[in-house]
C-alpha cells in the first residue's frame, strides 16, 4: 500500500503558523492549521512592525504588497529624553534605501487577515480546534482536540504563542521518555518584569505620518508610530515592582490600562503632546504583561516550537513577529529539502530529529542575539539603571553610524525560503552587510573596546572633574 504523503500539523493560526502554511503550500507539502479561537483575525488592539528581514519573506510569498499598500513607510524617527533633550534621525529611510524594503506598522489583525485572505487552501485552516493532547505513534504523531477530533501527521508544529499548549505537551512527553531533559531552570526561564499598554489612536495634530517617536522616562517609555492618514499606533511599557516567573503573571484589564494611562497622562511624548492625547483619541487599547524568555529545548520527538512559543521578547526593537516569520521560512526550507532528497518514503524518528536539530542550530544564535537586543532595548529605553541612563543619554545620540551599521548587519542575516527566488526589489544592502571580514565576536569586541573609553571619559567628567577643579593647582 502506498505510504500517505508527509503531513505537517500546525497548531496556532498565528503569524508564525500562517506564514508556515503559506511556505508549505508553495512547496506542495500537505498540512493543516488548527486554531483554538473562533476567528483567525480578532481585533486585540495590538500591532506589529514589519522590518526588511520579515518583509523579504512575505515578498517571496507574494503577499508583502498587500500589507505595504495599507500603510505608509517610516522615514524619520525622533527620540526624547526626560531632561527635554531630543534628536532626530533618518535611520528608517536609510534602512529602506539599503535593503529595498521599508519599515512599516500594521494592526496585527490586518496582517493576519492578509495572510488568511491570500492563503489558497482555506479548508486547511480550521477554527475552534483547541489541542489538548499529543500522542506518539510508531511512524508519526497525532493531536487530539477538545471536541474529540484527531489529526495525524509526521510533524507537529507549535505556533500557538507564549501560552503554548504544545510546549506543555512537548514537556510532558519529554518527562515521560527522557526524564531530566527539561530542567527546572528551563521551566522557570520565562519571566515578566514589564507591563505594557498597546493602543491605536486617531490622528493627533503634530504627529506626522511616516514618523515614529521614542520618549524615554525613568522606569517607563512611550513609543509611537504614525501610519496612513495619521493613525497612531503606540505602546507604553513600565517596570513592575518585582519580577514574576511564568505562569504566575499579573493579569490586566481595560480598567488597569485606563489607570496606567491616567497615571502617566502628563508624560511628554513630543513637543506639547503627552500621553493624555493618545488616550483621548484611542480607538482600541489593551494591557498585558510582557513575558521575556528564550527556551533551550525547541523540539522533542516529532514536535517543534516556533515564534513566541519558544522565544518571547518585548516589543521595543520590533523584531518579535519578524523573528517568527524567519522561523517559519527556515523550517519550511528544511522540510522541503528532506522531502526532495528522497527520504519522504521513510521519515523515521531519526530523520525528523536530525531535521529539527538542524533547524534549532540554524536559528538559535540569531534568535539569541535578537532576544538579547530586545532585553537591552527595553532597559535602555526605560533608563533601568545609572549606566543605561548614561549610555542612553550621552552616548546613544552620538553613535548613529555605529548603530545603523550594526542594525544593517543584523537585518542582512535574515533567513529566507530557500526554494523560492529572492525578490527582485532587494537592494545591495543584503549582500554588502552580510559580507564582513570580521566575525560577530570581533565586531562585538571592538564595539566594547570603543564604548569603554567613552563611558570611562563620561565617568571622569561627571565625577572626577568637579573634584579636581576644586583642588589647588601646583606650580
Curated annotation (Swiss-Prot):
* Molecular function, one GO term: monooxygenase activity
Keywords attached to this entry: FAD, Flavoprotein, Glycoprotein, Membrane, Monooxygenase, Oxidoreductase, Transmembrane, Transmembrane helix
Pfam families, sorted: FAD_binding_3
The UniProt entry annotates the active site at 216
So, what pathway does this thing act in?
Secondary metabolite biosynthesis; Alkaloid biosynthesis; Mycotoxin biosynthesis
**From which organism does this entry originate?**
Penicillium thymicola
Report the protein name in the record: FAD-dependent monooxygenase penE
The Swiss-Prot or TrEMBL record describes its family as follows: Belongs to the paxM FAD-dependent monooxygenase family.
Name its cellular compartments. Membrane
Amino acid at each position: 500500500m502506498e505510504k500517505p504523503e508527509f503531513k505537517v500539523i500546525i497548531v496556532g493560526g498565528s503569524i508564525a503558523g500562517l506564514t508556515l502554511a503559506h511556505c508549505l503550500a508553495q512547496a506542495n507539502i500537505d498540512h493543516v492549521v488548527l486554531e483554538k479561537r473562533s476567528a483567525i483575525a480578532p481585533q486585540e488592539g495590538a500591532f506589529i512592525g514589519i522590518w526588511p528581514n520579515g518583509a523579504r519573506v512575505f515578498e517571496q510569498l507574494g503577499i508583502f504588497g498587500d500589507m505595504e499598500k495599507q500603510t505608509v513607510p517610516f522615514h524619520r524617527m525622533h527620540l526624547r529624553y526626560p531632561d527635554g533633550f531630543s534628536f532626530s534621525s533618518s535611520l528608517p529611510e536609510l534602512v529602506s534605501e539599503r535593503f529595498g524594503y521599508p519599515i512599516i506598522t500594521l494592526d496585527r489583525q490586518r496582517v493576519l487577515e492578509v495572510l488568511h485572505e491570500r492563503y489558497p487552501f482555506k479548508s486547511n485552516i480550521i477554527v475552534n480546534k483547541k489541542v489538548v493532547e499529543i500522542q506518539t505513534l510508531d511512524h508519526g504523531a497525532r493531536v487530539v482536540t477538545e471536541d474529540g477530533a484527531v489529526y495525524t501527521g509526521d510533524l507537529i508544529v507549535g505556533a500557538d504563542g507564549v501560552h503554548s499548549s504544545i510546549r506543555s505537551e512537548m514537556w510532558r512527553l519529554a518527562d515521560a521518555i527522557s526524564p531530566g531533559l527539561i530542567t527546572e531552570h528551563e521551566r522557570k526561564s520565562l519571566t515578566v518584569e514589564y507591563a505594557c499598554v498597546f493602543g491605536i489612536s486617531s490622528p493627533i495634530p503634530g504627529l506626522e505620518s511616516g514618523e515614529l517617536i521614542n520618549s524615554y522616562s525613568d522606569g517607563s517609555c512611550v513609543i509611537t508610530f504614525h501610519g496612513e492618514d495619521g493613525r497612531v499606533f503606540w505602546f507604553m511599557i513600565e517596570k513592575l515592582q518585582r519580577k514574576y516567573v511564568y505562569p504566575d503573571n499579573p493579569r490586566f484589564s481595560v480598567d488597569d490600562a485606563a489607570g496606567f494611562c491616567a497615571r502617566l497622562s502628563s508624560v511628554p511624548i513630543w513637543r506639547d503632546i503627552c500621553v493624555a492625547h493618545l488616550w483621548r483619541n484611542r480607538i482600541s487599547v489593551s494591557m498585558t504583561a510582557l513575558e521575556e524568555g528564550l527556551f533551550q529545548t525547541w523540539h522533542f520527538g516529532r514536535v517543534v516550537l516556533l515564534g513566541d512559543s519558544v522565544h518571547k521578547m518585548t516589543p521595543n526593537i520590533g523584531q518579535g513577529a519578524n523573528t517568527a516569520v524567519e522561523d517559519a521560512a527556515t523550517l519550511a526550507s528544511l522540510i522541503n529539502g528532506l522531502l526532495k532528497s528522497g527520504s519522504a518514503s521513510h521519515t523515521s524518528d531519526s530523520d525528523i530529529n536530525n531535521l529539527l536539530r538542524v533547524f534549532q542550530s540554524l536559528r538559535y544564535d540569531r534568535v539569541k542575539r535578537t532576544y538579547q537586543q530586545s532585553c537591552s532595548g527595553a532597559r535602555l529605553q526605560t533608563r533601568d539603571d545609572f549606566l543605561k541612563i548614561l549610555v542612553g543619554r550621552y552616548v546613544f545620540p552620538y553613535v548613529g553610524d555605529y548603530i545603523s551599521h550594526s542594525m544593517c548587519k543584523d537585518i542582512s542575516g535574515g533567513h529566507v525560503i530557500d526554494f523560492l527566488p529572492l525578490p527582485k526589489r532587494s537592494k545591495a544592502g543584503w549582500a554588502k552587510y552580510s559580507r564582513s571580514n570580521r566575525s560577530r565576536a570581533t565586531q562585538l569586541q571592538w564595539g566594547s573596546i570603543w564604548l569603554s573609553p567613552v563611558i570611562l571619559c563620561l565617568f571622569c567628567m561627571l565625577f572626577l572633574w568637579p573634584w579636581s577643579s576644586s583642588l589647588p593647582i601646583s606650580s
